[in-house]
Structure formats: structure tokens, C-alpha cells
Amino acid sequence: MGAPATAASGGGDDDDRDVVFEYLLCTEEDAASAGSFFQQLQGPAPAVSSSPSTTTATAPAAAGSCDDGGEEEEEEVWTVDVVAELIGGEAERSHSPRADYPGRLRSGRPADLAARADSVAWILKVRELYGMLPVTAYLAVSYMDRFLSLHRLPGNGWAMQLLAVTCLSLAAKMEETLVPSILDLQMEDARYIFEHRTIFRMELLVLDALDWRLRSITPFTFMYLFADKVDPNGKHIRELIHQATQVTLATIHDTEFLDHCPSSIAAAAVLCASSEIMQLVSIDHGTLVSWRIIGLDEEAIIRCYRLMQQLISSNNVGRESTEITMATTTTTATTAVSSEEVVSSSPPSKRRKM
């Protein structure tokens, strides 16, 4: 068994945190035989199979697969105080990766950046396969980044896949009405198949690292609000939400957007969508000031907007993500707004755990 994984620099309580991990993960069986699950991440993959044996399964019905990311409107009145409180809540680092994480990720080992990119792509594929809400994929990547900002996983391949599966499982439990089984989640391009117990233990590890704070503020929290500001008559709301959702999903590939808060990403995405659909909004500081939203960082939104325009116009992975997700939701644009359930088609055959 290898040495414990190295925690991210700057975390004074990381040693205590690892002790908590060991306590949580050893209570379900004798500590002498269980050992440290976090240490096991250094070694061979536990309880996995690369068997060619296959079985078929039908993807469960998506729970309200709507382009607004699952933040369904219930005649909510957006008061100045409510919006200001939401924007103020973004400053809580407990719901975001460590402030130094984006820089460390971009300047660190290329393998870490590549592993994150692979995990993001996998999460988006599974989200597409099961018709999950956009916010589910966004939260899964957010949980993954928050965990990685605190702990560095070994470069053995399977540990990162285990983290991605775990974060998507947690996000699905938070947002989806019908959650695919652990085995079904791993059917899409999975190199390893993990047992339910392994995923459960990793969930405890992630939950403790995130201080059990899973209900996070996301760009989808603000999507309808900003769309209403751009199109108060509601003539283009469906298209605005649909296009802004695709842009937002594309941003999770690009680590540059880790430097931007959810409200800035949401506002910039809506403005990008409006420039494509309506061609009416002139993007400048005055436009954003006219929204009269307390706490909104107009300059940050303009920077994020320009970055998004580069992302959309380029041929990088972000654009590919937009094209993939566009294909997914084109056929459900109408049902997205009406929040009707959409049943996914049966997925292809998959491997099963031996």
C-alpha cells in the first residue's frame, strides 16, 4: 500500500482532515482490516473489472430535463434583497475551490489538467446519455474541483475516474428525481467498474472534504433573472435560456472560467445568447448598470463575456462541448421550458462488474 496522497499546499488542517477520513471510512468494518481508504487510492484499482461480458439496461427517465438547469420557477419574486443575498453568498469559499486552485491546476502537472478534461468530458457524456439536468453536470464538476483543490490524487488513472463517478453520483442525488444506478453511471467509456461499496466510501470522503455543503449557487440560479433583464417581454426567453445553458456547459471545460463567479458566468452567458438571437443588446458597462442589481460586478461580467466569445468562436474543446450539448437539447427545447419529463432512449450495451 502506498503512502497517503499529498494534500494541496496551504491547508493547515489537512492532517486533521485525513484523520477524519480514516475514521469515517473505517467504521463500516474493522479498522485493522479496512486500513485507510485514502491510502488505497495510491494502489491498484479496487474491485474493478474489464470483462467483455455485457448486459443491457434502459436509461431511466430524466427528471424534468429542462435547459434552466433544474431551477424551476414557482412564481418566485426576485426582490433586490434576495438577489443581493445570492450574489453575496458566492463569496463563501466553502462552496468554491480554493482561491489558488485555478493557478495551481494550470501551472502544475500536464497530466492533472488532462485528467480533469477527461473527467469533464465523461460527465457531460453521461449527462447526455441519461438526459440529466444541466445543473447536475455543473455541480458534479464543481464538487470535483473543490475536492481537487484540497487533495491531489495519485496519477494512476483509476483514482480520478472514481472521483468523477462519485461526484456525478452525489450531484444526481441532489438534483435528479430518478437517479441511475452506480453500475449504470459507469457504462459510458469507463475503463474501470467500481463496486457500490467503493463508491459509497468515496462519497463519504468527498462529503467530508466539502463539509457536506452540496447545495451550491450555480449560474443556473441566476439564468431566468438575467434573461428577464435582457428580454422583459418574454418573446425570446426560451431561446435565451436554451442557448445560455449550452454556453454555460461549455465553460466547465475551460479552467479560465474557474476565476469567475456563478453570477458573472450566468450574466455573460445570457448576453452571449442575446447577441446571437436578438442582436439587440449592446454589451457595455452601462447596460449592466441599468439592470440595477446590487452586488453585481459589471467589470467581471464584461471580462467573462469576452472570454466566452473567444470560447465560442474558437475550435477548442469548449466549442466541441457546445456542439455536443446542442445536439442533446435541440429536440427538447420546448419541453425544457414546460418542465415535462423526457425519457431517454435505451443506451447501448455495457460491461458488468464480475
UniProtKB/Swiss-Prot annotation:
Residues 44-66, 331-346 have a biased composition (Low complexity). Belongs to the cyclin family. Cyclin D subfamily. Keywords: Cell cycle, Cell division, Cyclin. InterPro entries: Cyclin, Cyclin-like_dom, Cyclin-like_sf, Cyclin_C-dom, Cyclin_N, Cyclins_cyclin-box. Gene3D superfamilies: Cyclin-like (1.10.472.10). The keyword Metal-binding does not apply. This is Cyclin-D1-2. GO terms for molecular function: cyclin-dependent protein serine/threonine kinase regulator activity. Residues 37-74, 331-354 are annotated as: Disordered. GO terms for biological process: cell division; G1/S transition of mitotic cell cycle. It comes from the Eukaryota. One of its GO terms (cellular component) is cytoplasm. The keyword GTP-binding does not apply. It comes from Oryza sativa subsp. japonica.
